[in-house]
Amino acid sequence: YLTDETTEKFPETEISGIDKEAAIEQVKSILDEIGVEVSKPRVYSLTYEKLEENTDYSQTDPNGNAPHQWTEEDAAYAIVFKGTIDTLPITEVGYRSGPAAGERIVGIVGKQGLIAFHALNIYELETENELSDEILTTQTVLENIQQKFRNIMITDKVEIEKINLEYVPVLKNVEKGEYELKPMFVCMARQNIEHSTDKEDNGLIGDSSIFPIIFDAQTGMEIQIGGTY
């Protein structure tokens, strides 16, 4: 999955020898052809140098195979779109609420053209309903987050980096495979965690974790990640 951490691992904006705008248009043309409305994409530059840097060649996959040996020909753009309905994006975060999941649209374009295209969990709108309540303010969402952590003993600070209003799919009918797209505030939180080392100097090493916190935009109720809504 491509997450906020991917930006930190692949910070470059361009790849020599690959036209970024042409790469974006190549993926966008597929989405236009199948009738998927999308927002402006995020583009990650998967350069050869960073692919090498972020690959642990000492690790093997479950079948015992060693990682791919990268070359400069492997450099590519990872182009990530969010599906939208009336310009409001459908979430792509990796939450789970029963069998519902966020929408994921990714195209990989290299020097030889399109390498891979994934469009997962694409939702087709059948009917529209009026909202039963007004959308909450972001201030209310922040207060809900403060309340969430108020009675939890944590030693490492949690920072909210993003608050986005997005549609989140919620399972409505299992047999018919029907979902309801509900407006939610998707909050991306970062927690920097320090671990003690085994060294005699009792040193500390840092680690960072990014995770979503999701609230119903009308009721303020939190979706429990991994459970039912």
Give, region by region, the residue ranges found by the protein language model.
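A general secondary-structure signal for short beta-strands and their flanking turns/coil
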Residues: D74-A78, A100-G102, E180-M184, S208
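Charged, low-complexity helical/coil segments in non-catalytic cytosolic or luminal regions
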Residues: S97-L181
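A short, surface-exposed beta-strand/turn
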Residues: Y1, I90-A119, T197-Y229
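Accessory, solvent-exposed terminal regions and/or long lumenal/extracellular loops of proteins
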Residues: E178-K182, N192-S196
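Preferential activation on post-signal-peptide N-terminal prodomains/segments
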Residues: Y1-R96
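Conserved histidines in hydrophobic membrane contexts and catalytic metal-binding motifs
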Residues: V27, G107, F185-Q191, G220
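Generic short beta-strand segments
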Residues: K82-L88, E166, M188-E194
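Structured segments of extracytoplasmic/periplasmic soluble domains
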Residues: Q26-E37, N144, K148-I152, C187
